[in-house]
Structure formats: C-alpha cells, structure tokens
From Swiss-Prot:
CDD domains: SAICAR_synt_PurC. Belongs to the SAICAR synthetase family. Keywords: ATP-binding, Ligase, Nucleotide-binding, Purine biosynthesis. NCBIfam families: purC. One of its GO terms (cellular component) is cytosol. Transmembrane segments: none annotated. Pfam families: SAICAR_synt (PF01259). It catalyses: 5-amino-1-(5-phospho-D-ribosyl)imidazole-4-carboxylate + L-aspartate + ATP = (2S)-2-[5-amino-1-(5-phospho-beta-D-ribosyl)imidazole-4-carboxamido]succinate + ADP + phosphate + 2 H(+). This is Phosphoribosylaminoimidazole-succinocarboxamide synthase. It comes from the Bacteria. PROSITE patterns: SAICAR_SYNTHETASE_1 (PS01057), SAICAR_SYNTHETASE_2 (PS01058). One of its GO terms (molecular function) is ATP binding. It is an enzyme of class 6 (ligase).
Amino acid sequence: MEKREELYRGKAKSVYKTDDADRLILLFRNDTSAFDGKRIEQLDRKGTVNNKFNAFIMQKLEEAGIPTQFDKLLGDNECLVKKLDMIPVECVVRNYAAGSLVKRLGIEEGTKLNPYTFELFLKDDAKGDPFINESHVVAFGWGTAEQLVRMKELSIKVNEVLTKLFDDAGLLLVDFKLEFGVFHGEIVLGDEFSPDGCRLWDKDTRKKMDKDRFRQGLGDVIEAYEEVANRLGVPL
C-alpha cells in the first residue's frame, strides 16, 4: 500500500490518500487538544497508544458484528482504513452524567442514567459542536432518516459491547462519541475509539482515566491511557 499526499489534518490525526481509491491511512499524532482545539499540547507516546487502543476496540466491535472502517495496523502510529463518506454528526451515548450534560441540565456528575441517553451534535468546531436533533440532520441534508436509525442502532450495540468490556476491566464507560460514514452504501463506524473520545472512570475510586485529565489539568494523562490499555490487554 503506497502512502500518498495528506488529505486532511485534524486536531490529533492526519489522513493520507493511498494508491487504492477505497483506502486511507490514519496517522495518530501526539497532539492533544481541548475546548474545540483552543488548547493544544504534545504528549509523548499518545499517538502510539491511541492507534493501538483504537485497533483493539475496533476489532472487538467487528467481532460483535459492528461494521467499522478499520482494516489493519501499519505501524506504531498508523493504520489502514476504508475511505468513508463521513456524516458530519457526532452520536453521543451517556451512561453516567458528565461533561456538557452536567452543564446543560444541572445534573450531578456521576449520576447513573437509566436508561442511557443518546444525543446528536453537529461536527463543527467553529460553532462549538452544537447540540442538534434528528429533524435538523434531515432538514439540512447532513444525513437521512434511514441513516439516523442505523447510526442509533449501531451506537446502542457499541454501548452494549463496550460497557461489558470495560466493566470486566474494572472501569465504568461513562460516555462516548461515535462518528459514522457510508462505504459502498453501508453505514460504517468511522473515526476512532480511544480515551480521547470517551470518559472512563475506575469502578471503585471513580478516578478519571480519560482526556478529562488533560481538560481539567489533573496530570498523568498518558499514564492513565496506558493503564486502561493494560487492563484491557491492549498490546502496546
């Protein structure tokens, strides 16, 4: 597989074209951002940890019948993925109250949500990733009603699979965001799944083991990521 020019540079990953029109290479960088890219720092080992963490999770999801864009690892900080036509919507599943939900509704952080909640946000840093609903998505042409049904269905299945996976490792899956795209007419899970895009707490102590350590200045960010990976059995 030949790596060609950079197609897109995000806050923490770069996307490269390849000699296959249906495949891209994701490069996980050490960049760590918060507050819609307003704060960015370099954290040693982060690109490697997130690349291998993502590969592990995507393979677990594939085994559970969830279609993902992941193909294979290419190195410590690169992987080969399917080229998706991305839908500019973030799907957020919450099992416990945290983050923007706490700010919006005044719920106490850590409150267990029964059942989980499912939310949609427009993927637009300039607008602060605003909270939207299904009718916005369809009305503005960001996705179809049928695609939304499938995205919610897959998000719920991801939650079922990963809640158990993390629980077995002594961790609470507090919440997470997913992005989807279309590949040959099928809705497929895209982007990544790592501690950058979810909240993970130790089940006993409620210690935060995710990017909130960076957002809130708690320190030991990568050490926490590595501890989560080690508990899951991710080969780093």
